[in-house]
Amino acid sequence: MTNIRKTHPLMKIVNSTFIDLPAPSNISSWWNFGSLLGICLILQILTGLFLAMHYTSDTMTAFSSVTHICRDVNYGWLIRYMHANGASMFFICLFLHVGRGLYYGSYMFMETWNIGVLLLFAVMATAFMGYVLPWGQMSFWGATVITNLLSAIPYIGTDLVEWIWGGFSVDKATLTRFFAFHFILPFIVAALAGVHLLFLHETGSNNPSGLSSDSDKIPFHPYYTIKDILGALILILALSSLVLFSPDLLGDPDNYIPANPLNTPPHIKPEWYFLFAYAILRSIPNKLGGVLALVFSILVLMLMPLLHTSKQRSMMFRPISQCLFWLLVADLLTLTWIGGQPVEYPFVIIGQLASILYFTLILILMPIASLVENNLLKW
């Protein structure tokens, strides 16, 4: 008799995704981040659901309701900080997942990659709107500054901003709709993640060598289930340590001051995971130019399959490309640091140089390095 997991319509899908899936035998821990992102998303949806039970999306009571969650709700402080720091863990996993894709040439699976970039945009939008909800100083001014960027769009810009605000400034209407969008978007992210997985399983996973692994596959369970469980335990340990020992480490102290439209904080800055993009935005003196650079800093990922000039898929055997890749990582860390600094000398010029280097590396230097390596290896 055939096993039920191979015949039952629903179990069959689970089986072909998580149990009998043929996986390459040599994928490293860099391939763990897909499952870790899934865990992060589930965790965020669950903690978010419980927070939504006690939160009120009204300008008069939003800040107080978050205080109430932390002080009066059973383990409310834990749920709130799990959610806030869970977002940080989510982005750490996202950046490492994207970095893995760049290093090992996973972007050659174009449908999977493009949906991944859409997922990145969706998660960034969700995180931005979530940051507005506590209605602290940085929530209010962050929302004002970032939504205001849309006014740089010619002709329709101002109307668009006022339409998003639901008035002439960030106010009750803005907070209410941001809460609605923040609630619905994670479910859209979950659906997109399902499509992401669907396209991945059409081709099978890539592997560190970038070569076809069809001749050497192993079942996902038990080999990679146990490996994913180890990754999950490390993730939970890291998140628990952050939440229980220094929950405010990655937050902004200004967000413990209730939103005040009459008082601007000295340094308006987003959460740490947006700082690299914020630095690129600020490095261009022109408003529209800055907005375009900001969008293109993420959108450039969509061009990766077109910029791939190497005859090898992975960077595993390409030392020049490896050096440029790690230079790109260092550059992104520099941009993250600059994004959190005030707009003054020498930070402005460092930010401008780092922004130029970012686009130069991706659009010019890495494709040229690949061509040089093709010649050196006589391919």
Curated annotation (Swiss-Prot):
CDD domains: cytochrome_b_C, Cytochrome_b_N. Heme b b566 binds at residues 97, 196. PROSITE patterns: CYTB_CTER, CYTB_NTER. GO terms for biological process: mitochondrial electron transport, ubiquinol to cytochrome c. GO terms for molecular function: metal ion binding; ubiquinol-cytochrome-c reductase activity. Changing residue 117 to I: In strain: Isolate TM-2. The keyword Amino-acid biosynthesis does not apply. Keywords: Electron transport, Heme, Iron, Membrane, Metal-binding, Mitochondrion, Mitochondrion inner membrane, Respiratory chain, Transmembrane, Transmembrane helix, Transport, Ubiquinone. Heme 1 (or BL or b562) is low-potential and absorbs at about 562 nm, and heme 2 (or BH or b566) is high-potential and absorbs at about 566 nm. This is Cytochrome b. It comes from Scapanus townsendii.
